Amino acid sequence: MDDIDNIILHSLRQIDCDLDEDLQGLEQFTPAVLVRTVSKCLLLIDPSLDLPQTLPPGMAQRFTVTARLAEACTAVGYRRDIGYQTFLYSNVAEVRRVFMFLIEQLPKDSTDAADPEAPLDRVTDLENRILDSMRQQLRGRKDPATPLDLRNATLGWAGSRSRANIPFVTQSDVTAGTGLRGRKWLQTILICVFFLALAQKLSNTGYAGAGFGRRKRMKWIGGRQTTDDSILKLQAYYAQNKAQCPLAEELEEAAETPDRLGQLDALEQEIAAIETAISESRRQRRELHAKRRTVAESAQAVESVAEKLKEEKKIKERTHILLENPEVNVAKLESIIAAAGEKMKKLQSQWEAHRAPLVATLEEHQAKNSDQIESARHKSEEVIVDLQTKSALHARLVQEYERMGRTVSRTAYTSRILEIIGNIRKQKTDIDKILHDTRSLQKEINSITGQLDRQFTVTDDLIFRNAKRDEYCKRAYILLVALHTECSELTALVQETGTVKREVRELEDQIENEKDRNVVTNLAQIGQDLEEMQRESRRLEEAIQQLELSAGRNGTK
């Protein structure tokens, strides 16, 4: 259901419903937001309606406004139960059904943002042809095992105002007589139909040219769908020039052979073993890397200590050499120091001789280029300000880009639709298998029951003939009748047990539905609204009493 909620939110934002970016699901809709969005949709469907745009603060006005919205939804064709409680004390399932119906009724030009005359590239044209082929395959396909309710559940528009005659979300009796799995299967089918109907309304998806006509009726989705060359080309394009996928029929035939299944199992086991070995090797590699880093750090510490010891050794060796003949060595050092001092004085005089003209030249250049330096300083300040402005603009654009990136692309919707179709096919196969097993079991039960009844009749007739003359036959007849009675009671108990289990499952389904209705939250909200109405009633009574008192005083005067 998250995908449907995303599509609903995207469609509401396309018609300028002013939804916050923090809204990520229908469960976050407050009554005020719900009233505003539903009113916007109804005004787009029928501009002649006079509907309020906001929810007033008073409880009496709230009941009036929500009741008017419920009547407007019924007037445009909504067939399910709807009233003020749908807006004030709603649950996600009811809100989703209402929005699905309203979005289906929206005029086409209110949600289609793509230019129908825009040129199509080669890939878009290929996708359009694929979607046309899928639509033709899905139209008019019926399966003998499909319930008649589902065969006749169509989505159509009547009249010139693009209103649904009986939309698929309003069929209240479609799931009558079916179990929990049938209802889930039907729910998945309706989700897929809703995906196909809403795909062309996405402004950034490019489905405007895909050919999903809203005025064309769509039959129940069923049966096998063949894979044509266009689908293979599209898959190859999205796989970035990878190897072409073989035909779906060859894959199914190859998958059904026992040898190929055995080979696949062996390959999967080998892959699992290789993955285990790879993970073990990676773990060992990480351990060795950690050990290598530890050893390298230790070696580096030892090398640094060795370097320090070498320096100390050199100093001590020189000191030892000097201490062997101290007077001569001290005289040599003093002569070296005196020579170094003389050399330093000579270099200082040479430096002063070169420094004076250089300083004069530097001062001359500074005086000459002071204006250029000041201009460069001002320009650098302007560049810094411009950089700050552009950095803020870049941050804002990055936020907008991230917000725009939440929109799901056309490829994601296409793959999701194909995935839902595959799930429907799989669920249909499971349901057909269950129905076949149930019918086979029922036939077997009926056959065995008939055989037992016939055998009892024959045995009863044979024993009853001899019961008058033979005492043992009489006792056998009594035991036979008792056995037949007890077996009948056991059969009745088994049937009652099945009935009780079925009722238990139905009650569990009802409990799940009640949990989805947010009964506790709605009761708390109703209690708050009741207290608010009581406070308003007391304020009105006090105002009436004050008016009566003022009127009585004026009368006495």
Swiss-Prot record:
Stored InterPro entries = CCDC22, CCDC22_CC, CCDC22_N
Q: Which residues form the signal peptide?
A: none
A GO biological process this protein is involved in? Answer: positive regulation of ubiquitin-dependent protein catabolic process
Q: Which UniProt keywords apply?
A: Coiled coil
Keyword Membrane attributed = no
Q: Which molecular-function annotations from GO does this UniProt entry contain?
A: cullin family protein binding
Tell whether Transmembrane is among the UniProt keywords. Answer: no
The residues forming a coiled coil are 260-350, 489-554
Domain of life, source organism: Eukaryota
- Record family assignment: Belongs to the CCDC22 family.
Q: What is this protein called?
A: Coiled-coil domain-containing protein 22 homolog
Its source organism is Anopheles gambiae (African malaria mosquito)
